[in-house]
Amino acid sequence: MKGKFISFEGSDGAGKTSVLRAIRADLEKQLGDAAVMYTREPGGDHISEQIRQILMDSENTAMDARTEALLFAAARRQHVVADLKPALAAGKVILCDRYVDSSIAYQGAARHLGEQEVWQINQFAIDGLMPELTIYLDIPTELGLKRIATHRTDEVNRLDKEQLDFYHAVRHSYLRLAEKEPARIKTINASQSLDRVIADVKAAMHAKFTDLFANEF
């Protein structure tokens, strides 16, 4: 069986973690645990996770924007080689929490490094490996940040401490990417109830890969 590479993107507070948890659980019921690989960026193998610790450390406030972009790309390269390519070769369905689009939105747009410039850095890192499908969970910036303030329980990291304009830039970049690549990036209204969002995500996945969630459609 040919592997499938699906990435999940979203502005802060879009509910990506909750959606991914549900999608992963239901997909594992259908295909079996061994056929599904959940992974995240930055992260994956132990080298990428070590880079993640540097990137997310709330004390690293003096990190240069280009350093940040290059570290994300380095972690991604290791992730591609150590995790993603082997999983695809084994025929697995990959559910990846963030990928290249995050770098374009966060470092390219919000850090003002340039979307094309950050894309070029990442082209070198990924060596042509792009998701066949990207699920983008879209939510108005203010609503997303309100959700975080109300419901977040995990540790606040360095990237959670930006100003409102930063998060507006992230969202607008994602929307531009979705408009530019409609065949790959499917935009889901994340302002809806969690059950509705999950249903819409499943529909988008099934439309691309008819064998996924076939019993629900």
Residue spans of the language-model regions?
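A glycine- and Lys/Arg-enriched "phosphate-lid" helix/loop adjacent to the NTP-binding pocket
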Residues: 102-172
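Walker A/P-loop
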Residues: 17
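P-loop (Walker A) phosphate-binding loop of NTP-binding proteins
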Residues: 11
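NTP-dependent small-molecule kinase module
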Residues: 22-26, 142-217
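ATP-dependent small-molecule kinase phosphotransfer cores
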Residues: 30-126, 200
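Pre-Walker A (Motif I) flank of P-loop NTPase domains
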Residues: 2-5
